[in-house]
């Protein structure tokens, strides 16, 4: 296929799609140019069904530093592992695409997005999401799209689609919404305490804008789209299924209704193992034993899936016996750990998170050097999910995509209520350790983070709580669940996380397993989430009503002084020599910004006070009219040089030593002698003239003798 180009305008910027020129051996490939951002997307599919009980979809978002005209950092000067932003963007694209593949599809699919040029005012992630959907849609991969996504901002009561950098900085909302022509299927948002009504309207505005992008994709697919390949879907033997359901459905139904998680898992596992043992023995000699046992496992999964959903939708019974809108038992604790700067332990049923606060000088902020201009990140929220939290063994190592994503969600939820840098000049790190998990651990980490911040004396604007909402839908009827647990998440259709204060929402995240959800479901879920959020905030505020007025004794104290900008180099010294000497002497940490604000950090107040004295001395300037107790440091024929303070000397001219005539300076003064002087002049070069005689009363003039007249 020769190169074909398709052009439109979206949100005030040109959107150009090129097909047929590059990456032609992929199943589908596009080059998307949005503004001056250019993204190459290639989609490929394996020829055979993969083994395993899940759909092996991999979405990558690769940031090439040349796209922004930069050299990669590090010794190797080559792109390494994806940045956090790249990982989050890959997840952002994966989530709306994944539900658009058929149930039982098991061929491996890879969607690789490479940013070739970067324009900070034209969203490369949104171009990559568009390109991912289009590459799949024009390929022979059986993708039931297209989908598209947009960013939505909110400024002065107006919604803005795909805001530029300046607009986003002024926006009260940073929302990414994706979906198909029919419905929304992915949401990711941070917001400055906006109401449910505003958030819902933003979602609908975003979905409305998506229609334009989907129509553009459909236009392109009609011209260059390939016929979809026939692939084998994972389907179980219907006779085998009927046999197992008839024999064991009642036993599995009973096991599913055991309320306690571990007991329920043991009961369901016992039924499954009994079934597997029977059929493994029955078909031991069959050459298709592996396929049969795969089908047995899949049938049992489907039976459990169906029973959980039936109980909720028909009987209105949840696996643990709760009502549809009931939250699990809550518990909140502060000061769980000694010595640290703040800690909070939050428990919701069998989900438990410990959050630990660390405060540090601003010099500890994280420097982010990606495609965007380098910036410093003051607040970090890290989320760890060890396998012991679910009673299992597993991989330990660097944080995976899920942990990075959950940490980022908590970060967005909490950063909206943090004090400004002027109010609280600290770098802030929260680490959430998930100690138990039975669903909604990311929301537990937000609640624990609120406890740790308030316990640590961080003056947040308001406490934040999070809740996860679920959905069971049969296409006609649906049930919205409050505070979903693991089983409801696994077998449900939606995981909709809502975090916020009593004033409004600070973060949203939604993932679904069906094609999309309606505005009515969104509205109902937001309303139930608000009620639940207030219940959780009641528990948090009963534990600690407001941030403590003081920091923990172990936290670094801070004092700030202001110096003239032209004195910054004096405090730092050549090659940092002066500031390093101060730090070595006092043991403090010092940050100096470009405006001359000097922040001094230490757990020892005496060390802070001593540092302030040293810096004040370094930046001190002589002033005309002020008197100084000085020391003679050099004598010349024309006068004496005296040291006023630190590195500031002044000249006392020979005529300014005394009111009487001084013939020889050394007859009056000697090096090392202490004298009081008054500054009488500072010239344009900063040279200081001082006087000793100005401090001595001027002797009266001798009376003139009267002349005698004869």
Swiss-Prot record:
EC numbers on record: 2.7.7.8
Ranges where the S1 motif domain occurs: 625-693
UniProt-listed Pfam families: KH_1, PNPase, RNase_PH, RNase_PH_C, S1
A molecular function GO annotation: polyribonucleotide nucleotidyltransferase activity
Top EC class for this record: transferase
Gene3D superfamilies documented for this protein: GHMP Kinase, N-terminal domain (3.30.230.70), K Homology domain, type 1 (3.30.1370.10), Nucleic acid-binding proteins (2.40.50.140)
Every KH domain range: 556-615
Swiss-Prot/TrEMBL cofactor(s): Mg(2+)
Binding site for Mg(2+): 489, 495
CDD domains in UniProt: KH-I_PNPase, RNase_PH_PNPase_1, RNase_PH_PNPase_2
Residues in coiled coil: none
Keywords: Cytoplasm, Magnesium, Metal-binding, Nucleotidyltransferase, RNA-binding, Transferase
Positions with biased composition (Basic and acidic residues): 700-710
UniProt KW Metal-binding keyword: yes
HAMAP family reported for this sequence: PNPase
Family assignment from sequence similarity: Belongs to the polyribonucleotide nucleotidyltransferase family.
PANTHER family, per database record: POLYRIBONUCLEOTIDE NUCLEOTIDYLTRANSFERASE, POLYRIBONUCLEOTIDE NUCLEOTIDYLTRANSFERASE 1, MITOCHONDRIAL
Record's protein name: Polyribonucleotide nucleotidyltransferase
Gene that produces this protein: pnp
């Amino acid at each position: 296929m020769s190169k074909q180009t398709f052009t439109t305008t979206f949100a005030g910027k040109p959107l150009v799609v090129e097909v047929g020129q590059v990456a032609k051996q992929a199943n589908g490939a596009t080059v998307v140019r949005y503004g001056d951002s250019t993204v190459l997307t290639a989609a490929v599919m394996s020829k055979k069904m993969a083994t395993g009980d899940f759909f092996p979809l991999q979405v990558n978002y690769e940031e090439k530093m040349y796209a922004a005209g930069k050299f990669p950092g590090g010794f190797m000067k080559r792109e390494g592992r994806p940045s956090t932003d790249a990982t989050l963007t890959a997840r952002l694209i994966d989530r709306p695409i994944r539900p658009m593949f058929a149930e039982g599809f098991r061929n491996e699919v890879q969607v690789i997005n490479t940013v070739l040029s970067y324009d900070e005012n034209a969203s490369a992630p949104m171009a990559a999401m568009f390109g991912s959907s289009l590459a799949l849609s024009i390929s022979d991969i059986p993708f039931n799209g297209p989908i598209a996504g947009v960013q939505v901002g909110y400024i002065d009561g107006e919604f803005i689609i795909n805001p530029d950098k300046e607009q986003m900085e002024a926006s009260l909302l940073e929302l990414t919404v994706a979906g198909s022509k029919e419905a929304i299927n992915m949401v990711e948002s941070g917001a400055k305490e906006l109401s449910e009504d505003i958030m819902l309207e933003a979602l609908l505005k975003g979905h409305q804008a998506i229609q334009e992008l989907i129509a553009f994709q459909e236009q392109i697919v009609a011209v260059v789209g390939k016929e979809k390949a026939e692939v084998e879907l994972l389907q179980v033997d219907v006779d085998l299924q009927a046999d197992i359901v008839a024999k064991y459905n009642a036993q599995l139904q009973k096991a599913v209704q055991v309320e306690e998680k571990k007991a329920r898992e043991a009961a369901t596992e016992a039924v499954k193992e009994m079934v597997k043992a029977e059929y493994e023995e029955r078909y031991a000699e069959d050459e298709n034993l592996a396929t049969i046992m795969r089908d047995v496992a899949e049938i049992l999964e489907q039976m459990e899936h169906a029973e959980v959903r039936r109980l909720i939708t028909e009987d209105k019974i949840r696996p643990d016996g709760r009502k549809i809108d009931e939250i699990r038992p809550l518990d909140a604790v502060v000061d769980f750990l000694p010595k640290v700067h703040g800690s909070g332990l939050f428990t919701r049923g069998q989900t438990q998170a410990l959050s630990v606060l660390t405060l540090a000088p601003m010099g500890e902020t994280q420097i982010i050097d990606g495609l965007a201009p380098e910036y410093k990140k003051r607040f970090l929220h890290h989320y760890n999910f060890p396998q012991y939290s679910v009673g299992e063994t597993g991989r330990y190592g660097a944080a995976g995509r899920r942990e990075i994503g959950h940490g980022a969600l908590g970060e967005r939820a909490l950063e909206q209520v943090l004090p400004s840098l002027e109010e609280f000049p600290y770098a802030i790190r929260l680490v959430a350790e998930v100690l138990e998990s039975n669903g909604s651990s990311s929301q537990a980490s937000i609640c624990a983070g609120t406890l740790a911040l308030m316990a640590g004396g961080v003056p947040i604007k308001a406490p934040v709580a999070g809740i996860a909402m679920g959905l069971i839908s049969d296409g006609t009827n649906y049930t919205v669940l409050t505070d979903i647990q693991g089983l409801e998440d696994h077998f449900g259709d939606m995981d909709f996380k809502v975090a916020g204060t009593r004033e409004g929402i600070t973060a949203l995240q939604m993932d679904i397993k069906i094609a999309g959800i309606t505005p009515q479901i969104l509205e109902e879920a937001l309303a139930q989430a608000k009620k639940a959020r207030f219940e959780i905030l009641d528990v948090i505020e009963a534990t600690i009503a407001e941030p403590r007025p003081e920091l923990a004794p172990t936290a670094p104290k801070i004092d700030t002084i202001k110096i003239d900008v032209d004195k910054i180099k004096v405090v730092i010294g050549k090659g940092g020599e002066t500031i390093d000497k101060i730090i070595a002497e006092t043991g403090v940490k010092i940050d100096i910004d470009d405006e001359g604000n000097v922040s001094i950090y230490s757990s020892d107040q005496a060390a802070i006070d001593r540092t302030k004295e040293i810096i004040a001395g370094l930046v001190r300037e002589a002033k005309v009219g002020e008197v100084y107790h000085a020391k003679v440091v050099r004598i010349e024929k024309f006068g004496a040089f005296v040291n006023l303070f630190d590195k500031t000397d002044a000249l006392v001219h020979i005529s300014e030593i005394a009111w009487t005539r001084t013939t020889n300076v050394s007859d009056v003064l000697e090096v090392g002698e202490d004298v009081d002087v008054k500054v009488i002049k500072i010239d344009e070069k900063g040279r200081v003239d001082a006087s000793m005689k100005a401090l001595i009363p001027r002797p009266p003039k001798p009376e003139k003798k009267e002349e005698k007249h004869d």
